[in-house]
Amino acid sequence: VVHISRPVDGPTPTPTPTPTSRRLFLALAGALAAAPLLDVRRASAAPAAKGLDDPAKKEIAMKLVSSAENSSLDWKAQYRYIEDIGDGRGYTAGIIGFCSGTGDMLDLVELYSDRKPGNVLARYLPALRQVDGTDSHSGLDPDYPKDWRKAAQDTAFQQAQNDERDRVYFDPAVRQGVTDGLRVLGQFAYYDAIVMHGDGTDPTSFRSIRKRALTKAKPPAQGGDETTYLMAFLDARVWAMKQEEAHSDTSRVDTAQRVFLRNGNLDLDPPLDWKVYGDSYHIG
């Protein structure tokens, strides 16, 4: 999605990333083979570093995004969320802000219909194909919002939201973060950027934001300092947000992600305290 910040209502959304823990395990196995006298029991008991795809860290990520998108930590309450927020992208809905005007809502409903033919949203597929790329509600009104909320009670639709969130936004962000040598906070910064800006080729897309940051600093994988690079990335993100009036409130970066960065909390370890739109949030 090229997504809009919205301080309002609505619960839980991908090639598969290589988990950080798996790579660490393979590296450990190689070290054990090279040093057979090493105490295997002690080595295997050493805790592996966690990435954003660790379940507990992913839950934190969902809450952080929900605080910015829905002014609530209850991200699972957002499956049913749907409204036109006046950003030119038609209806925005669900746990990650799927939009009728940007194609990802169409992809979601197609996935749901493949898994559950004849569902309450399937009849809107022709209309969703027609309005893709526009802010039109043609063929959707008046019943689409009501039917979306009805579908959101179906665990199959909830799972479809989760899976599309992971395929389009979460997994690519984590993969790129790992490639760049970033820890949990950096992976989250990438994820939040993709949620709002998408991963297209326009000047404010995630990949363009990353390229802008790379002109100022190198990520750890290229020998750079992680904090310095992340500050450059967040600077580039703020620049991108300010290019569009609807995104001009940068508090989800300046009073959230920058706070964690300045505190040196590169692994997003609780407790976490931050603000978005002036509202305070806490994860213990």
Would you name each region that the model predicts?
Residues 36-48:
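C-terminal region of N-terminal signal peptides and the immediate post-cleavage residues
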Residues 28, 32, 46-156, 160-180, ...:
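Cell-wall polysaccharide-cleaving catalytic domain and substrate-binding groove, primarily
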